[in-house]
Curated annotation (Swiss-Prot):
One of its GO terms (cellular component) is cytoplasm. One of its GO terms (biological process) is L-histidine biosynthetic process. It comes from Neisseria gonorrhoeae (strain ATCC 700825 / FA 1090). The gene is hisH. Pfam families: GATase (PF00117). CDD domains: GATase1_IGP_Synthase. The active site is at C85 (nucleophile), H194, E196. The lineage of its organism: Bacteria, Pseudomonadati, Pseudomonadota, Betaproteobacteria, Neisseriales. Heterodimer of HisH and HisF. Its EC number is 4.3.2.10, 3.5.1.2. This is Imidazole glycerol phosphate synthase subunit HisH. Its main location: cytoplasm. It catalyses: 5-[(5-phospho-1-deoxy-D-ribulos-1-ylimino)methylamino]-1-(5-phospho-beta-D-ribosyl)imidazole-4-carboxamide + L-glutamine = D-erythro-1-(imidazol-4-yl)glycerol 3-phosphate + 5-amino-1-(5-phospho-beta-D-ribosyl)imidazole-4-carboxamide + L-glutamate + H(+); L-glutamine + H2O = L-glutamate + NH4(+). Keywords: Amino-acid biosynthesis, Cytoplasm, Glutamine amidotransferase, Histidine biosynthesis, Hydrolase, Lyase.
Length: 212
């Protein structure tokens, strides 16, 4: 089995690679895990992981420039697919960041947190939302196996998912209001938080993906 981590020059790629390889050892899988910016090699992989970090317009431009956008669209149709952070945001129709069109796998938009964001006590909250936060699993999913409800994951983001179809929401967090932080449809699973930075919980989720 081969698992491709898409390398389009945008993302914490070597951290992702290290985490996925550790997850592969935990899963006991005889799988080749590799970085690739080659559309043909991505198309031959059995599973695909799509990380991303930085501004969505830059990420979309880099993806298209490398000819990887079509490889991603093809993988979304029929391979187990895991989007992480901006890689997950790119799967939506549109983002308010730079008024950027995405790949359109999930209907809906990526919206920015309010600039004057306050908690229930009226204290101002920083944007980006950065640090550990609990995640509520709103539906059952194979990638949640062994992960308790309200487990903490690591976030760094100023924009959040706003899916058209609430049935695609698999997990939520609060900042301070609830927002979707995990979405899924068919063979595709995507998280706003950084799975590769989320210690044991992140490794368990990646292990579950390799077993999916």
């Amino acid at each position: 089995m081969q698992t491709a981590i898409i390398d389009y020059g945008m993302g914490n790629l070597h951290s992702v690679l290290k985490s996925v390889r550790t997850a592969g050892q935990l899963a006991g899988k005889n799988t080749k895990i590799f970085l690739s910016g080659d559309p043909d090699r991505v198309s031959r992989a059995d599973k695909v992981i799509f990380p991303g970090q930085g501004a969505m317009p830059d990420c979309m431009a880099a993806l298209t420039r490398g000819g990887l956008d079509e490889a991603v669209k093809d993988a979304l149709k029929n391979k187990p697919f895991f989007g992480i952070c901006v890689g997950a945001q790119l799967l939506f129709d549109h983002s308010e960041e730079g008024n950027t069109d995405g790949l359109g796998w999930f209907g809906g938009k990526v919206r920015r947190f309010a600039r004057d964001l306050r908690d229930p006590q009226g204290c101002r909250l920083k944007v980006p939302h950065m640090g550990w936060n609990t995640v509520r699993q709103t539906q059952n999913h194979p990638l949640f196996q062994g992960i308790p409800q309200n487990t903490r994951f690591y976030f760094v983001h100023s924009y959040y998912f706003a899916p058209e179809n609430p049935e695609t929401i698999l997990g939520e967090s609060d900042y301070p209001s609830p927002f979707a932080c995990i979405v899924g449809k068919d063979n595709v699973f995507a998280t706003q938080f950084h799975t590769e930075k989320s210690h044991d919980a992140g490794l368990t989720m990646l292990k579950n993906f390799l077993n999916w």
